[in-house]
Amino acid sequence: MDSVTRFAMAQREVGLAIGEPPAQKGYTPSVFAELPRLMERTGLSDVGSITAFYTVLVDGDDFNEPIADAVRGILDGHIVLSRELAHKNHYPAIDISNSVSRLMNDICEIEHKAAASQARDIIATFKEAEDLINIGAYERGSNIKIDKSIEYIDKVNSYLKQGVNEKSSFEDNINNLKNM
């Protein structure tokens, strides 16, 4: 399958052709009925498991458009790619602040979750204060959390970048995250 978005657009055309009324942004009700059936084919069963990576193309970076919103409600997590990060030559251009895993609590050790939470907090705090920092309006010492984010944001961003030919093991990544 090319993308969930194109699947939804094709299903919308089928729905409209058989007389279904358009609902959210022109998508017919059958689109939203088919999405869970399509996506829930993957996962764990008594004879094995299937892992899938679905892509959703969003119009104008609107992550609340109907298909993206429906898919987020169905899947156990989502990875958001950011044009802004790509423009900064930050690859992979994964937007950690907007990406979510509902399974992380079930599959990660306590120290791993704590380190990941700290990194997410540094990113979120820096992002909130970035405009003030960039124009020189933020005065160091006025907010401990922002000071910490300024101190660690380059380390976090460096950790999140990976060269095309760079290799690292899962264990190395976790240790580097914990030691940051």
Where are each of the predicted segments found?
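P-loop NTPase catalytic core
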Residues: M1-M180
